[in-house]
Structure formats: C-alpha cells, structure tokens
Amino acid sequence: MATVNQLVRKPRAPKVDKTNVPALEACPQKRGVCTRVYTTAPKKPNSALRKVARVRLTNGFEVTSYIGGEGHNLQEHSVILIRGGRVKDLPGVRYHTIRGALDCAGVNARRQARSKYGAKRPKS
C-alpha cells in the first residue's frame, strides 16, 4: 500500500485498455476508398479464397477489410463503409465491409440474415 506522500508525488496511473480496432478511433463505422481488391488464402486447416480489400480511410489509416457474402461489386476506388470485427483465419484482417452501404451492393438472393448483407426483403 502506498503512503499518502508517495501518492502526492506520483499519483496512481490509470489502466489503459487496448482496442482491437484502432483505425475506427472509437467510431462505430468509418468510410474509406478501396486501394486494392484481392483474394487471400486462410490459415491452416482452412482452405478458400477469401475476398478482402485494402482500404484507405478518411482518417488516413490504411487497413484490410473482409468482404462477406457471395459475390461483390467492389473494385479499386470504390467508396465503402467498414466496421470492426476480425476474421479469425485471416491474419491482419480486423475489419468487415458493410454490405449494402455506399458503393458496396448487398448480396443477391439472400434469404436469411438479410440485414447483415444489405439484402432487400424478397417479394413473397
């Protein structure tokens, strides 16, 4: 236990909490421009061609964002919205692209979990 005199000289340091999504700067989403759209292979034991985009954000950060869902219309210079959320089998991918916002179209013919993929309600 520190004495009063010790605390007067050197106060207690507040705990610093580390964020998993530093590029968002405590915002729920950020806008950015795709600088490169490509596919990458996941870590073992998984096998696929995961779609990702390198994005230059409005705050100057350059991050890698995962593009979820089947098919996408993104290319270089597309303006997209990203949110936090890592992809466990892709090292260095800590952000997700929000489907159905800005230049990123929603997933076609999506029936379930539509809100997560920007898909409109199908005509019954």
Swiss-Prot record:
A single cellular component GO annotation: small ribosomal subunit
Disulfide bonds: none
InterPro entries: NA-bd_OB-fold, Ribosomal_uS12, Ribosomal_uS12_bac
GO biological-process terms attached to the record: translation
Keyword entries, A-Z: Methylation, Ribonucleoprotein, Ribosomal protein, RNA-binding, rRNA-binding, tRNA-binding
SUPFAM superfamilies in UniProt: Nucleic acid-binding proteins
Positions carrying 3-methylthioaspartic acid: 89
Any one GO MF annotation of this record: tRNA binding
Keyword Flavoprotein: no
Gene3D superfamilies, alphabetized: Nucleic acid-binding proteins
Pfam families: Ribosom_S12_S23
HAMAP family: Ribosomal_uS12_B
Family: Belongs to the universal ribosomal protein uS12 family.
Subunit structure, interactors included: Part of the 30S ribosomal subunit. Contacts proteins S8 and S17. May interact with IF1 in the 30S initiation complex.
Role, per record: With S4 and S5 plays an important role in translational accuracy. Interacts with and stabilizes bases of the 16S rRNA that are involved in tRNA selection in the A site and with the mRNA backbone. Located at the interface of the 30S and 50S subunits, it traverses the body of the 30S subunit contacting proteins on the other side and probably holding the rRNA structure together. The combined cluster of proteins S8, S12 and S17 appears to hold together the shoulder and platform of the 30S subunit.
Identification of the protein by name: Small ribosomal subunit protein uS12
Species, as recorded: Shewanella amazonensis (strain ATCC BAA-1098 / SB2B)
